Amino acid sequence: MFKGVQDCSNIRWIVYFNPSITIRIDLLKRITIISTIFAAVSMTTLVVGASGATGRLLVEQMLERGQHVRIIVRSTDNLPSEVISHKNLSVICASILDLSESDMAEHVGECDAIVSCLGHNLSFKGIFGKPRRLVTDATRRLCNAVKENSPNKTVKFVLMNSTGNSNRDLKERISFPQKCVIGLLRLLVPPHADNENAADYLRTKIGQSDGVIEWVAVRPASLTNEPEITPITVHPSPTRSAIFNDGKTSRINVGYFMAELVTDESLWDMWKGQMPVIYNV
C-alpha cells in the first residue's frame, strides 16, 4: 500500500508501506547517496536481458551506484557506448540457453545477485516462435548454477515479471472477466505462460527458506518510456485490474526499483519472497 508523497524544498519523497515497515526514499537525490554509500561495499550482479529496453536502464542504474555488473547478451549493439566501455562492466556474448552447465556456473560464480529482465520480442516470431520457455528455463538454469557453486552467502534473484501474473501465495482476488481473459492468454500467448511459470518456479521450487537463494518477482504495470525517475507506489498485490485498468510503470522506474532491491538491504528484507507490484504515481 502507498502511504504518501511529500514535496519539501524540491525533494520528492515516496513512502513504501508494508503492514509493519515504512521507508522513505529521496527520489531526486537517492542515486547520488547510494553511489556514495555503496562505493566501498561494491557487489557483483549478473544481469540477463541487459540489452532490452528495461535491462539497459537497470545496468546504467547499477553502474551509477558503483556496482560491478556482468551481463550475458547475444549482442551489444543496443547498449550505449559509455556503458560498454565502463570499467565495472563485464560482457559475456552468448545466448543464455546455449550455455553449458559449467559455463553457467562460472558466470554466476561470486555474484551477489542475479537480475533477469528477459522477455520475448513483440513480433509474431518472438511471441509464437521458439524458445517458448525462455524466461522459465533461464530462471531454472541460473538457480541451478548458483546451487552448483555452493556459495557461502545467500544470492539474491530478482525477476522482472508482470501484473498479469498473480501471486498464488496470496490468493489474489481476480474478477471473473479477468480470469477468462487470463485463461485465454495462458493458452494462446506463450510469453504469458512463460512469465507465470518463471515466477512459479521461484515461488514453489525455491520457496521462502531455500538457504542459498532469496528472490523477488517485480510486477510492473503497462510499461512506458520516460526520461527520468519519478515517484512510484509499491504494493504486495495489484490495486487495479491488470487487464481492464492496468495503470502505467515507466521502464526507468522499474530499473530503479530493481537496483534498489539489489543494493538496499532494508528494502530487500521488506520484499524478499514476494511479488511486489509497482505503479507510477
Annotate each PLM feature.
Residues 44, 53, 241-281:
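Mid/C-terminal beta-alpha module of Rossmann-like enzyme folds, strongest
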Residues 45-65:
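N-terminal Rossmann NAD(P)H-binding glycine-rich loop of SDR-like oxidoreductase domains
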Residues 141-190:
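Conserved Rossmann-fold NAD(P)-dependent oxidoreductase catalytic core, especially the SDR/UDP-sugar
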Residues 71, 80-141, 145-148:
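NAD(P)H-binding glycine-rich loop region in Rossmannoid oxidoreductase-like domains
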Residues 129-136, 175, 187-197, 247-252:
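Short-chain dehydrogenase/reductase
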Residues 199-225:
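Conserved beta-loop-beta element that borders a ligand/cofactor-binding pocket
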Residues 68-74:
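Conserved glycine-rich Rossmann-like NAD(P)H-binding loop of the short-chain dehydrogenase/reductase
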